[in-house]
Each structure stands twice: as C-alpha cells, then as structure tokens.
C-alpha cells in the first residue's frame, strides 16, 4: 500500500474502491437520513430492523472481544479460535456486520419508495463483499494454509458453519 501512495494515479484505484465501498455500505443510511418532510411513525419494521441491528452489533463486538482476548494469551500463538461465538460460526464478526447493515435497511423500509429501494444494495453489498470477495475467502484460504493438515482444524471446519450457526445443534 505504501508503494501505491507514491503514485497518485495508482493510489487513486484503491482510494476510489474504498470510497465506493463506503458509499454502497452507507446507502441505506443516506436514503433514510435524506428524507424530506415528516418522518413516518415508527412501526413493526422499524422494531425488527432495530432489533436486528442490536443483535448484529452485539455479535460483532462480542466476537471481536473474544478474538482479541484469545490472541492476547501467549499460549494461543499460532492457534485458531474455536471458543465462544467462534465455536458456533467460523466468522461470527462478519455475521454481526451483515446483520447490522441488514437491520439498518429494514429499519428504513417505510422510507423507501421507488428508486430509494436502491438502499437494499447496502446489506447485499456487505454480504457479497464479506462472503465472496474479501473477508471469508481470504481468511479461509489463510486458515487452510496454516492448519489445513491439522485433524482438529479439519474437524472444526467440517462441524462449524461459515456464518450462520446451527441453533440447538451440539458441536462434535
């Protein structure tokens, strides 16, 4: 990245991609916050969206905290985390992020009219980015490089869903 900074033309590509990422992710918030006139009264969809946002935010914060605490212990150096939320999902932090942005889009559903439905691009973009482009594919590839031959990791990978946990199902 530092090499890109020395050339304005080459630096423009990642900068533009980051700007696009921010715009697409914030799209639902922008549509909600730029409504003219009086805001519609809060309804069922607002409650569902807010609840989903709270769940997503909580999952992401808890997952990140658990991973930070795990990585802070010297005896865990070079190991993968498979405790807490990470015992139910291989990427609970990404699950939280996806739920959070989906909750925001649902919260604004009463505001969306016509072309404003483009706000749904936000959670769709976040999901596709994290599951198909950057997050999960890169981390899964790295995990396979590090622990792919380890039978315990193979068992963890086989028994732990990528994102959405199997509620009520015990791990093997």
Predicted features along the sequence, with ranges:
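Juxtamembrane helix-capping/reentrant segments at transmembrane boundaries
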Residues: 1-13, 79-86
